[in-house]
Amino acid sequence: MSFSVEVLAGIAIELQRGIGHQDRFQRLITTLRQVLACDASALLRYESRQFIPLAIDGLAQDVLGRRFTLEGHPRLEAIARAGDVVRFPADSDLPDPYDGLIPGQESLKVHACVGLPLFAGQNLIGALTLDAMTPEQFEVFSDEELRLVAALAAGALSNALLIEQLESQNILPGSSGVFEPIKETHMIGLSPAMTQLKKEIEIVAGSDLNVLIGGETGTGKELVAKAIHQGSPRAVNPLVYLNCAALPESVAESELFGHVKGAFTGAISNRSGKFEMADNGTLFLDEIGELSLALQAKLLRVLQYGDIQRVGDDRSLRVDVRVLAATNRDLREEVLAGRFRADLFHRLSVFPLFVPPLRERGDDVVLLAGYFCEQCRLRLGLSRVVLSTGARRHLLNYGWPGNVRELEHAIHRAVVLARATRAGDEVILEAQHFALSEDVLPAPPAESFLALPTCRNLRESTENFQREMIRQALAQNNHNWAASARALETDVANLHRLAKRLGLKD
């Protein structure tokens, strides 16, 4: 069998039929799999010495979330270096990146593999990979025929990336206009909620507006901030991060605005604050809702007038900083409760974004699981880490109250458990490797901590009672001090001070 003119014309037509790049890519690889009668096909994008799957057919869904580094995958490195069609023999010693990732064939290894590097001019922009369980599957197709397929795919991918680059304003007035791949931000997800979020990020990134990023703990608000910064004209300048929840009130002002020598005990030299560090760049204020009202007023002044004062200094400094703020609180409710300034809220929320919880992202769970599996594989030096069908189903059926962060920890824990029970450097994750159901959480103690303390005096009893309340709040909030302070209805700085006095922290 070989390609006829009709077959090639059919592939070209399929590339024009799709609505949007993703649909065209999917049509391309689905058609190729049918024409070549192979078990799996994939279109990959090349970026920063790694291949990123754009569309797959015949492979496990979590492949779309994986990032295949050249260092970790010698076959893909060979494809990247070759510059032409690469055929791997069935007895090749090089491991196939898709071993264990063909549904129903998790325990079997791929036999036949062909790689087609894709170029835009002299630049490598991606690859097509074709895999089959039958060793001689691709022998009937000549290299010339496969080069024609690669040329069609390269044209489609090159056009798509160039359009994406223009839409994201990565080619700005005065730039050379030379094609450059867009940087990966690890915002993995194809669900409608994530697709909408990515569109909103593209819209606001090129502006200089302040952005308020809302969402539950663990959803990836910091990644959103990085994506906004990378897509902005300020990307060549620093993105400075500050977690407001981890700031004791006594040093918060100094952290934000800096201080001069002698401003307070311990100020032995002048020190720049985060605003100065972020000058001409971006400042990301995580957990903005934890700032005291006094600091909120000073932050508002910076946003209004663009000048700061170091602690202990009468002079003002001009700064040009874009502020991105994140919170897991409902700041509208905080404003109504008097805990957050209404004027600051309106200054920050010029363009609000909401990061959806993982439970609302559908099959994105599997894509993210694939990404974390690949990270674990590289970190632990394993040849492969794959999810069984049962494990994928198990992950999809769980509610993920801790969102993406909980999924990451669950995958890492499962890999360690599976590795301990299986010899060799190959890990297949099964449902039993994940302890996700609520019934596996430790049961609360039979005796309530509200029981009457058996101490000799009122002060000792009160302190023991306070210690137990703080311990319980920390345990119930994953040792997050800000969340624990909210649960106890106290200020986080006061909670830190009380914990120190009670001997609960250094």
Curated annotation (Swiss-Prot):
Required for the expression of anaerobic nitric oxide (NO) reductase, acts as a transcriptional activator for at least the norVW operon. Activation also requires sigma-54. ATP binds at residues 215-222, 278-287. CDD domains: AAA. GO terms for biological process: phosphorelay signal transduction system. The keyword Transcription applies. Pathway: Nitrogen metabolism; nitric oxide reduction. Keywords: ATP-binding, DNA-binding, Nucleotide-binding, Phosphoprotein, Transcription, Transcription regulation. PANTHER family: ANAEROBIC NITRIC OXIDE REDUCTASE TRANSCRIPTION REGULATOR NORR, TRANSCRIPTIONAL REGULATORY PROTEIN. The lineage of its organism: Bacteria, Pseudomonadati, Pseudomonadota, Gammaproteobacteria, Enterobacterales. This is Anaerobic nitric oxide reductase transcription regulator NorR. PROSITE patterns: SIGMA54_INTERACT_1, SIGMA54_INTERACT_2, SIGMA54_INTERACT_3, SIGMA54_INTERACT_4. The keyword Transcription regulation applies. GO terms for molecular function: ATP binding; ATP hydrolysis activity; DNA binding; DNA-binding transcription factor activity. Transmembrane segments: none annotated. It comes from Salmonella newport (strain SL254). Residues 481-500 bind DNA. The modification 4-aspartylphosphate is found at residue 57. Residues 187-416 form the Sigma-54 factor interaction domain. InterPro entries: AAA+_ATPase, GAF, GAF-like_dom_sf, Homeodomain-like_sf, NorR, P-loop_NTPase, Sigma_54_int, Sigma_54_int_dom_ATP-bd_1.
